[in-house]
Amino acid sequence: MQRELPRTILSLSRACQEGVDDLDYEIIVVDNGSDPCPMLPPTDPPVRFKVVNVKHPSPVGAMNEALAMAEGQVIGAWIDGARMASANLLAAVRDAAAHHPAPVIAIPNRQLGSARQASAARDGYDQAVEDALLDQAGWPAPGTDLFAVSWPEETSVTGAMLESNALFLTRATWDALGGYDPAFSEPGGGMCNPDMLSRAVAHPDTQLIRMDGVATFHQIHGGTSTSDEDLAVSRVKEATRAYTALRGHPPRKVRDRGWVFDAATGVMDKG
């Protein structure tokens, strides 16, 4: 994450986020035992950084530590430090959250490049290619269109969704759900993230809000399930077996249409 995390942090800072001059927000990073520890860029707001006391293969403990540290009333969980934010993400979340007292705001997932990275890597897509792609796109200059140089993981804004790598809930909802389930103890957390989205959507009185025109963008790296096809298949199979043993059924994609917030117009479609 020495290469990827600084970009992710920068993408969330005021230097890259648009329409957040009046937004009071914080960026928290809880490191799960990286060696070496990542070097973070100076940003506004400054990063609140912590290293977990006991390193664990699963990020669940680190995620829950970060949730406990958070001081805001709407908290976004970013389980993958390699995912950059679209420039409108925080402003759009702020505006969407105002429409419901208990929103479940699920940001769509995209991957940099023209295809799924686990497949593209076999055709030569690597960090150097991605660096050149971002340079050509002009990032981090204002107005950079990362959508034009990325591939969508979901078929449509209202399509079936297994997980969101930037999930925003209120403090009350996070507390009621108990954060991420520590039972997901395998490397990478297995299906802890799909489980979190599923439980949040099913929780009483919450409202799923899908986001149109907003996304996170995955950078290729040596992670557990995104950048190597054979490893991805193996990890998903292992995680599916573990999830099924824990929950009594395989992971299920969220098919509820929910509400749809258009980030470009600020209009909420309640269906």
Label the predicted regions:
Residues 88-135:
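Conserved donor NDP-sugar-binding/catalytic core segment of glycosyltransferases
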Residues 12-53:
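Acidic donor-binding segment of Leloir-type glycosyltransferases
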Residues 54-70:
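Glycine-rich, basic loop-to-helix element that forms the pyrophosphate-binding segment
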Residues 73-83:
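Short beta-strand-to-loop acidic/aromatic patch adjacent to the donor-nucleotide binding site
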Residues 70-73, 179:
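Active-site acidic short loop of glycosyltransferases
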Residues 114-117, 123, 127-157, 205-211, ...:
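C-terminal, non-catalytic tails of nucleotide-sugar-dependent glycosyltransferases
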Residues 1-17:
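Short, well-formed alpha-helical segments that are part of the catalytic scaffolds
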Residues 161-169, 173-178, 185-206:
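A short, conserved alpha-helix in the catalytic core of glycosyltransferases
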